[in-house]
Amino acid sequence: MKAESADGHIGWGEIWCNFPSCGAEHRAQLLNTVIAPLLLNKDFSHPSSAFEEASTKTHVLALQSGELGPMAQVIAGVDIALWDLCARRAKLPLYQLLGGSNARIGVYASGINPDASLQTVQKKYQEGFRAFKLKIGFDTELDIANVRSVREWLDPALELMADVNQAWDLATALDNIPKLESYGLSWLEEPLRCDSEMRQWQEL
């Protein structure tokens, strides 16, 4: 999304949505019909003021409509755009406007799907990545084979992670996690559904 100030500066933000793709259209509608009318043609001294305005005035609506997540994602996209706008106006990188350091930040290659996992890791390694996160949670034998092949190819000092994308139930997680222990994963992401009962997380 694009934000523009009265003095002609612009900023860009991203409103994130996972599947289905029509969810992005829904968030665009929330932006245009709910959030934008709250903020357009108003004077905000700071991005946080606009964030507070949008969050406060839509909270009850989000509760009543069951839209807490989508509404928060739209407001976050607006917040990003306004911070970007302020940085461009100040002619500063955003990290400097926020007072941050210019120290190097480690990154990892993500979104490595189960088909051709090793080849994707090898390609990303050539591009300069030194940490990798595989998608698993499709088929246990395939998952283990992919993790094993990548781990065997990688230098043991390099990081390898896996993301289940909430595909397992508790029994499956308890069965599969021991099978992954020997591969030195730095972390295992979303092994259960995010709304799983606390007792399941505690047992895991």
Where are these regions (language model features)?
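Short, well-ordered coil/turn segments that N-cap beta-strands
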Residues: 101-107, 128-130, 155-158, 184-186
